[in-house]
């Protein structure tokens, strides 16, 4: 299969986050959807584009990309899905059907599809949610862009046996996160140490996540119930019901255009190959010289590829 290679470098980074400048362009807001309060950050004007983060992050993962998209003439909305960031952390509702319904309710509450379907972008677990949303509510989604994730139940599983050191570093958390109780026992109170290790290990340019950025991620991950809530996505997605829903969803191929890029030291070409199993119109490939945290490690390249795709 054909894969596009996008070479990334330090030139694709931006200066460290400047709150004073950022908050002149964007603002916090919340909306009640499906019985939960969802937090989001938005700004800019034009056709809306919805950004969905992954684990263990929040809307904040998009902070470098958002001004670039707004400058390109888009209304940019970065959402904290239930259980993430500053959204509510209920005891249930972390299966993909509910996550997709949350997005549909959120989009309706904000009137984002009044003028037609909107563009949706996901990273990591945000890719799971964005794909499920596009599959469950295809009339809502004009185009879907996804970054660095495998999709359990659709992405072919790794060969059985002891994984290589490289593979283990990339995938160990799938088995760990789905365990009941143990992750909470080990992680609560040690969020800073854990996140420091995670960002250092999975990033090619870990310095793009500054000490101030780490403080923000520690804040949302150390909040009461945050670890359990975020890991509930893995527990549902990797369980029998979640996998069955993935298989059923894959039988209805997406008709809207899809952009899929993995990171060279992340999932690589696996994501675009995965999306070609579930969609009929797929573009994408690999960000070379980039780690898993693509919106932070190469925000200029991420924004450029999004706008290229969504301007076609």
Language model features with spans:
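Catalytic histidine-centered segment of alpha/beta-hydrolase-like enzymes
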Residues: 290-303
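Conserved HGGG/HGGXW glycine-rich cap/lid loop of the alpha/beta-hydrolase fold
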Residues: 41-86
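Flexible "cap/lid" subdomain of the alpha/beta-hydrolase fold that forms the substrate-access gate
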Residues: 2-41, 48, 77, 84-121, ...
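A short, glycine- and basic residue-enriched loop/turn
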Residues: 58-59, 128, 290-291
